UniProtKB/Swiss-Prot annotation:
Pathway: Cofactor metabolism; pyridoxal 5'-phosphate salvage; pyridoxal 5'-phosphate from pyridoxamine 5'-phosphate: step 1/1; Cofactor metabolism; pyridoxal 5'-phosphate salvage; pyridoxal 5'-phosphate from pyridoxine 5'-phosphate: step 1/1
GO biological process, one term: pyridoxine biosynthetic process
Cofactor names: FMN
SUPFAM superfamilies found in the cross-reference section: FMN-binding split barrel
Function: Catalyzes the oxidation of either pyridoxine 5'-phosphate (PNP) or pyridoxamine 5'-phosphate (PMP) into pyridoxal 5'-phosphate (PLP).
GO molecular function terms attached to this record: FMN binding; pyridoxamine phosphate oxidase activity
Gene from which this protein is expressed: pdxH
Protein name: Pyridoxine/pyridoxamine 5'-phosphate oxidase
Catalytic activity: pyridoxamine 5'-phosphate + O2 + H2O = pyridoxal 5'-phosphate + H2O2 + NH4(+); pyridoxine 5'-phosphate + O2 = pyridoxal 5'-phosphate + H2O2
Co-factor remark: Binds 1 FMN per subunit.
Binding site for substrate: K54, Y111, R115, S119, R178, L179, H180
Entries under InterPro entries matching the protein: Pyridox_Oxase, Pyridox_Oxase_CS, Pyridox_Oxase_N, Pyridoxamine_oxidase_dimer_C, Split_barrel_FMN-bd
Keywords, alphabetical: Flavoprotein, FMN, Oxidoreductase, Pyridoxine biosynthesis
Organism for this UniProt entry: Ruegeria sp. (strain TM1040)
EC number: 1.4.3.5
C-alpha cells in the first residue's frame, strides 16, 4: 500500500490541489479559493495579503489584480511569489512557491468580462495601494467611471492576471496530537518532473 493513498494519492499535484479545493468549496463558509499571497519588496521585507485564486491550470495557479498595486510591483521586481491556502473546515492546507508571469491576453479579457458590472467599474476606479482622501472620493470616481464607460467596460491595461508556476508544492493535513501528514512536490527542472518527499510534521 502506498504511503500516499487517500488524500495524497496520485502523481499530479495540480489534480490533488483541484480535488482539495473542490472539497473546500462544499465545506468552507466563504471564499474557499482565498490564498495568502506573499511577496518581497526591494529591501527584502516580506508582504502578504489575501487574494482570490481563480484557476488551477495544468502547470500553474492564476489570480488577477491591478498591475499598479504594491503586490504587482514587487512581483515585477522579483519574478517570484508564494502562497498558502488554508481550510479550517478540512484542517488542510497547500503551500506553493514559484516563478510568476503575467496573463494579460485573451484569457484575462475573458475573465474580466465574466465579472459583475460593478466589479469591472470598480477595477477601473480603484488606484490600488495609492493614498485615498476618503470613501466618498472613491465613490465619486466610481460614478465618473460609470458615466464614461457605460454598461460594457473593457479590461483596463493596468489590470490582469498573474500565473504562478511552482517549483514547490506542499500538501498538509491535520493529524492527531500534532502528528500531521506533509508531502512536498519539488520540481526537477532538468527532467521536467517532480520529486515527492514525505516531511516530518
Amino acid at each position: 500500500m502506498s504511503d500516499r493513498e487517500g488524500l495524497f494519492g496520485g502523481d499530479d499535484p495540480f489534480e490533488i490541489a483541484r480535488k482539495w479545493l473542490a472539497e473546500a468549496t462544499e465545506t468552507e463558509i466563504n471564499d474557499p479559493n482565498a490564498i495568502a499571497l506573499a511577496t518581497v519588496d526591494a529591501s527584502g521585507m516580506p508582504n502578504s495579503r489575501m487574494v482570490l485564486l481563480k484557476e488551477i491550470e495544468d502547470a500553474a495557479f492564476v489570480f488577477y489584480t491591478n498591475y499598479e498595486s504594491a503586490k504587482a510591483q514587487e512581483i515585477e521586481a522579483s519574478g517570484t511569489a508564494s502562497f498558502v491556502m488554508h481550510w479550517k473546515s478540512l484542517r488542510r492546507q497547500i503551500r506553493v512557491r514559484g516563478h510568476v508571469t503575467k496573463e494579460n491576453g485573451p484569457q484575462a479579457d475573458e475573465y474580466f468580462a465574466s465579472r459583475s458590472l460593478k466589479s469591472r467599474l470598480g477595477a477601473w476606479a480603484s488606484k490600488q495601494s495609492q493614498p485615498l482622501a476618503s470613501r466618498s472620493a472613491l465613490m465619486a470616481e466610481v460614478a465618473k467611471i460609470t458615466a464614461q464607460k457605460g454598461p460594457n467596460p473593457k479590461r483596463p491595461e493596468f489590470w490582469g492576471g498573474y500565473r504562478i508556476t511552482p517549483i514547490e508544492i506542499e500538501f498538509w493535513a491535520d493529524g492527531a496530537f500534532r502528528l500531521h501528514d506533509r508531502f512536498v512536490w519539488r520540481k526537477n527542472t532538468s527532467h521536467d518532473n517532480w520529486t515527492i518527499t514525505r516531511l516530518s510534521p
